[in-house]
């Protein structure tokens, strides 16, 4: 068969020359590059999950529950408990990871001739999802401390009148939070919808933007995931909370039976074990503080983080520094921000290995 490349195929012109998204998956001693919860699921969760999956297996010849009402009810119960904001399943939508949730929102509210504004550096999938849905992405750069410049943000929104605005808090890759006051100012001037991406909310002490839903029912969507604090990255489950009319909107673009029977069942089990799973968050926050202090003592610059990762530098050549960590069997993330790298907070022994490597890297690059 003839060898083919992308250039030989009739793909969309704007996709030519692009690279697929994805962090390196390498077999090394310490992997701190994808912001997963390093603690494995509890034995009780695993046992219940095995039992539930076995029960579901006998029905795999049938399509799953199309609208995932039971799962959405469990998610609504969790959100109500952790935020103090009463939420029903009618206000909540779930999909295969928050990426699919965001994609569905862009399919419904973006598209050709429409725009989405974001504050980079931020989650790198946002412009990719925009491109995939043919929504024009507009960047309003963060300030030199990687925070949203409120005046610049409001001016950009007023000038460009975007259909969608992305606000990520805590922000990935920097880890800093955006205050509710700033989010309200953005909501007040935004002509379209504002998607607040709270993938790492469980690691932060800041109140959730879900508390603003009642005042901004036609504008605000808050997306979350079970991939980070929930120890469920392999389960691929994301969701958003909004007025129920937003759920009606994404139902127009979602694929039929988009959430498998096994995905729904597994996520319900994980939610029912949320207290034991989320108990690891306090451990990770304590480790984050310890690692941050260790990096500061080594002379690194750090953006204050309220997530499960640290954004640090400053390097003349951050990719060479990334390679230096990898040479020491520690895999972290080069997020293509000049001078900085990102490291996930891992188990204590993984963090020790990271700090030992960082000590040697500091001697070489700082």
Swiss-Prot record:
<dbReference type="InterPro" id="IPR004839">
    <property type="entry name" value="Aminotransferase_I/II_large"/>
</dbReference>
<dbReference type="InterPro" id="IPR005861">
    <property type="entry name" value="HisP_aminotrans"/>
</dbReference>
<dbReference type="InterPro" id="IPR015422">
    <property type="entry name" value="PyrdxlP-dep_Trfase_small"/>
</dbReference>
<comment type="pathway">
    <text>Amino-acid biosynthesis; L-histidine biosynthesis; L-histidine from 5-phospho-alpha-D-ribose 1-diphosphate: step 7/9.</text>
</comment>
<dbReference type="GO" id="GO:0030170">
    <property type="term" value="F:pyridoxal phosphate binding"/>
</dbReference>
<keyword id="KW-0028">Amino-acid biosynthesis</keyword>
<feature type="modified residue" description="N6-(pyridoxal phosphate)lysine">
    <location>
        <position position="228"/>
    </location>
</feature>
<dbReference type="InterPro" id="IPR015424">
    <property type="entry name" value="PyrdxlP-dep_Trfase"/>
</dbReference>
<dbReference type="InterPro" id="IPR015421">
    <property type="entry name" value="PyrdxlP-dep_Trfase_major"/>
</dbReference>
<keyword id="KW-0368">Histidine biosynthesis</keyword>
<dbReference type="GO" id="GO:0004400">
    <property type="term" value="F:histidinol-phosphate transaminase activity"/>
</dbReference>
<dbReference type="Pfam" id="PF00155">
    <property type="entry name" value="Aminotran_1_2"/>
</dbReference>
<keyword id="KW-0032">Aminotransferase</keyword>
<dbReference type="GO" id="GO:0000105">
    <property type="term" value="P:L-histidine biosynthetic process"/>
</dbReference>
<comment type="subunit">
    <text>Homodimer.</text>
</comment>
<keyword id="KW-0663">Pyridoxal phosphate</keyword>
<comment type="similarity">
    <text>Belongs to the class-II pyridoxal-phosphate-dependent aminotransferase family. Histidinol-phosphate aminotransferase subfamily.</text>
</comment>
<keyword id="KW-0808">Transferase</keyword>
<protein>
    <recommendedName>
        <fullName>Histidinol-phosphate aminotransferase</fullName>
        <ecNumber>2.6.1.9</ecNumber>
    </recommendedName>
</protein>
